[in-house]
Regions:
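N-terminal intrinsically disordered, cationic/polar leader segments
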Residues: 1-43, 47-50, 55-61, 68, ...
Length: 141
């Protein structure tokens, strides 16, 4: 999978999780974005079940922002086909989130959660290149 480190960092900073970003590798930034989205999806599901409409709308909005951050972080120059497929998947997820928000549809949230978990598992299986570099090399990442 291909992502731009700068875009991922700005997207993650925009959701208020600055503490872990400072020293994180680009690989870790994407993991943090995905973890943040999954945490908020679980929160939104509970808010729908408790009829917390205002909170649910805000939480789903944050998930949409995170997924947009993942989408704009894609590096289309590295693998055009994969990045286009991921962009289409992120667009689909956001459309499902909008439907979930409008209709209080827990099944749409569950679908997005499942898709994002699958992506995160694939991403987590990719070794972080900074683990294999010497200290002098990590500064260039």
């Amino acid at each position: 999978m291909t992502y731009s480190a700068g875009m991922a960092s700005r997207a993650y900073n925009s959701i208020g999780a600055q503490t872990q970003v400072a020293g994180a590798s680009p690989h870790r930034l994407i993991q943090l974005l995905m973890e943040g989205a999954l945490d908020r999806l679980a929160t939104a599901k509970g808010q729908i079940q408790r009829s917390e409409t205002v909170n649910k709308a805000s939480t789903i909005g944050k998930v949409i922002s995170i997924i947009d951050g993942l989408r704009v972080s894609l590096d289309h120059d590295v693998d055009t086909e994969m990045s286009e497929n991921l962009e289409n998947l992120y667009d689909y997820m956001n459309r499902r989130l909008l439907i979930s928000n409008i209709n209080n549809d827990v099944l749409a949230l569950d679908e997005v959660t499942s898709l994002l978990k699958e992506l995160k598992e694939a991403w987590d299986a990719i070794p972080d290149a900074t683990h294999f570099m010497g200290e002098s090399d990590t500064a260039a990442v």
